[in-house]
Amino acid sequence: MSLNTKLALPIALGLSLVTVTAFVAYYVLKRDEEENDNKTVKITKINTIEIHVPKSIVPALIGRNGSNIKDLQKKSGAQIHFKKFTDQDYDVCVVRGRADTTQLAETLIHDFIKQQPTIMSESITVPSWSCGRIIGSGGENVNDISHRSGARVKVESPKSTDKVAEHLVTFRGTKEQIEVAKKLVENCVSLERCRREIEQSKRPPRHSSSPPSPCPSPGDRDADADAQGDVDHTRVKYKRPETTGPSIEVYVSAVSSPSRFWVQFVGPQVAQLDDLVAHMTEYYSKKENREAHTLRHVSVGQVVAAVFRHDGRWYRARVHDIRPNEFDSSQQVADVFYLDYGDSEYVATHELCELRADLLRLRFQAMECFLAGVRPASGEEAVSPSGQTWDKWHPQAVERFEELTQVARWKALVSRTCTYKKTATAEGEKDKEIPGIKLFDVTDEGELDVGAVLVAEGWAVAGPAPSPRPSPPRGHTTPFGDLSKSKVLSMTGGGGRSSSVPKDHKDDGSNVLTVEGDDSKDKDGITASKSLASGLEKSDRHPLSISNFDLSYPDPSRNKQLNGSDDFLHGERQNIDNEITIDTLVPPSPLSNAPILSKTLQDEFKANMNRIDSHHSNLENLGKSAFEK
């Protein structure tokens, strides 16, 4: 028994240890199994959603530097990016993430799209002359309009090089934004129109006259026809034909006939010319300044300062001819052409003054043109002694043309260059090209074709492209063609008017000064021309007679040179004198007691050198403007 008892105790302990060990092993294994079960990775399905977003809303959805997209990703927990398509009007927004996050992101994106206002586009047309005001310096004004309205504003450039009368302005934004932008643009147009009207009102007409009265048509000249002519005038409207020539705004400054008139370009140079004329008038109105710039010798082709007797102002002019005064053989008159306006007039040589060199900085503004596509209804032509021909217009046709163009009243017209012709304005002068243009009066009611109105009223007939025809010669018989009968030009008692003076502004003879003879002079009644408002006193020095006036330049050694254009020209003449030597042509029987009338080829060359041709300068500017625009 004792032996069994001794064995039982170890056996019991052994069984206990085995049991405990087994239990511990089971517990440890069970725990490891549970831990392994807890470490199992849960796999979730990734969703991808594609949303079509209009291209106009994509920038707003992305936000500046992606701020809106980052905010949506943070709120939803999904990843968002875009696929762009150039051939579609929408982009694709790709949303990736768990089902719940992608659904939330999709909801946020759709809500954002619904909250966006409708983006639309509109366009309006504005006059081309207002584009500068709308755009501003360096685009300052158009950027300000976009900033204040919130809409995108763009002034469209013409597709062709043609300079059109209207430009297209496009707006892009909401309806409210576009309305604000349109009001701002219309305000710019109104301001520019007001500025142009004020600027035009500051340019007084170069004559004092009443408004133009309607002119009867050739077929019927009674009062009823007058009224009917007015109705026709307001009813005849034409659209400009599609041509390749540039359209430019011009003023008609002087008219000889529809076949010969002068225009000025509308632009900043107009104000510069007005300032120049005001300065010249103020300067040359002072007696001491006129005495300082007295011309001791006047030559053909010389650019001078001359007073225009119809308004008393001083202008730049060129001497085209020197002739004796028909009323005083001891006086000479110069046939001058006003380079900035196109008028021509006879002025006493002692009333001309030297033109300061600084007054030549502004180019001459008058450009000679002819009305393209029309001919006189009568088909008559005038012929000069040299055989040159030009169209002869009825005086009332010229008056009607002046009324339609509002000559010298600074009404802006649209011109389109159609053709050119070669012509010479003086006998022996080199031919130059004169542009043939069509004129249109653009109003709110429509466009009025001046040439078509003349044809409709019977003053002209439509014709093909004009063939080259020389302008009226500037000889001693008919120096101004259609204006040869003008009282201003021919110094006679009858005739018409100056090229920029209307029919209701005629001379009454008060401008002719009668010089009563004294004991030392002949008792015959002698008249001498005197400019209105010129402020020039009677000259005390003995004037040159027709027998001794000379077309050559004065001798620098005998005449003191003054500061101005003569200093520059004198240096050029000296250079020519060193290079050219031609014998003087002497008339066969000169007067014994008078200097010889000499006119050499050298003199002709010098005179041509002294001329500053405004027409070619304007033609070059016309060509450049067409390409620049």
UniProtKB/Swiss-Prot annotation:
Region (Disordered): 198-240, 464-526
Topology with respect to the bilayer: Single-pass membrane protein
The entry's keywords: Differentiation, Membrane, Mitochondrion, Mitochondrion outer membrane, Repeat, RNA-binding, RNA-mediated gene silencing, Spermatogenesis, Transmembrane, Transmembrane helix
Family: Belongs to the Tdrkh family.
Tudor domain ranges (all copies): 297-362
Transmembrane residue ranges: 9-29
Domain KH: from-to ranges: 46-109, 119-185
Effect of residue 142 to N: Loss of activity
GO terms (BP aspect): P granule organization; piRNA processing; spermatogenesis
PANTHER family, per the entry: FI02030P-RELATED (PTHR22948:SF29), TUDOR DOMAIN CONTAINING PROTEIN (PTHR22948)
Subunit structure: Interacts with (symmetrically methylated) Siwi. Interacts with (symmetrically methylated) Ago3. Interacts with PNLDC1/trimmer; interaction takes place on the mitochondrial surface and recruits PNLDC1/trimmer to Siwi-bound pre-piRNAs.
InterPro entries: KH_dom, KH_dom_type_1, KH_dom_type_1_sf, SNase_OB-fold_sf, TDRD2-like_tudor, Tudor, Tudor_domain_containing
Coiled-coil intervals, chain numbering: none
Name the UniProt record assigns to this protein: Tudor and KH domain-containing protein homolog
Main location: mitochondrion
Listed SUPFAM superfamilies: Eukaryotic type KH-domain (KH-domain type I), Tudor/PWWP/MBT
Function (record text): Participates in the primary piRNA biogenesis pathway and is required during spermatogenesis to repress transposable elements and prevent their mobilization, which is essential for the germline integrity. The piRNA metabolic process mediates the repression of transposable elements during meiosis by forming complexes composed of piRNAs and Piwi proteins (Siwi or Ago3) and govern the methylation and subsequent repression of transposons.
Phenotypic consequence of residue 69 to N: Loss of activity
Annotated GO MF terms: RNA binding
Keyword Nuclease appears in the UniProt entry: no
One Pfam family linked to the record: TUDOR
One Gene Ontology term, aspect cellular component: P granule
Keyword Ligase carried by entry: no
Record's compositionally biased regions (Basic and acidic residues): 219-240
